[in-house]
Design a protein with these regions (language model features):
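Short, glycine-/small-residue-rich phosphate/pyrophosphate-handling segment
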Residues: 90-140
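Generic hydrophobic/packing signal
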Residues: 18, 30-32, 54, 96, ...
Length: 185
């Protein structure tokens, strides 16, 4: 069984909805177990992360980067880095913000660099760019490095972030789970 862990921070609930979509996508791949871990619980669940075949990172984009709580957690993984505990695990990332750009690429790049520091194997979005104006197409924000979603500056809900962005996240989760399963053999 392939094990996928999703570590995320959500300040207002939007990124949690996206994390749940990513988890649904990963769980849709037969023989996959998924652990959804809020970043506040990640240190306590380090054994779950160490046992995972893949770790997917999720954070809102705040001021052009990962959120403070997510960065704080990243910095707590120094001992894991030193021992290369996550070497050759699959990695991927997703982010959400209130604007179409919002410098989300920088957030994904920060996650990618973090994964590279841990000698992980990054999996891209793997979906051709959709039409940004069409709120129903996959990958409407044209991200190649991971899932990008946009939320209205309103309460998080079943439609905020959009269904298309949630479906894009689900596709990322399924892609990561498929790679983890292949890697596991």
């Amino acid at each position: 069984m392939a094990k996928v862990a999703i570590v995320y921070h959500s300040g207002f609930g939007h990124t949690k909805i996206l994390a749940e979509a990513v988890a649904r996508g990963a769980a849709s791949v037969d023989g996959t177990h998924v652990d959804l871990i809020p970043v506040a619980e990640a240190e306590a669940k380090v054994e779950t992360l160490n046992a995972a075949d893949a770790i997917i990172f999720g954070s809102p984009t705040y001021m052009g980067n990962v959120s403070g709580p997510f960065k704080t957690w990243m910095d707590t993984t120094g001992k894991l880095w030193y021992g290369q505990q996550w070497k050759d695990k699959i990695a991927a990332g997703f982010t959400n913000s209130g604007n179409p750009s919002g410098d989300k690429l920088n957030t994904l790049t920060t996650m990618w660099v973090f994964a590279m520091q841990h000698s992980m194997i990054w999996v891209s979005q793997g979906v051709m760019a959709g039409e940004q104006e069409n709120g129903e197409t996959l990958n409407r924000l044209s991200s190649w490095g991971g899932t990008m979603a946009t939320s209205a500056n309103a309460e998080a809900s079943a439609d905020n972030p959009s269904k298309a962005d949630q479906a894009t996240g689900a596709r990322l989760g399924a892609r990561v789970a498929s790679f983890a399963k292949k890697l596991k053999g």
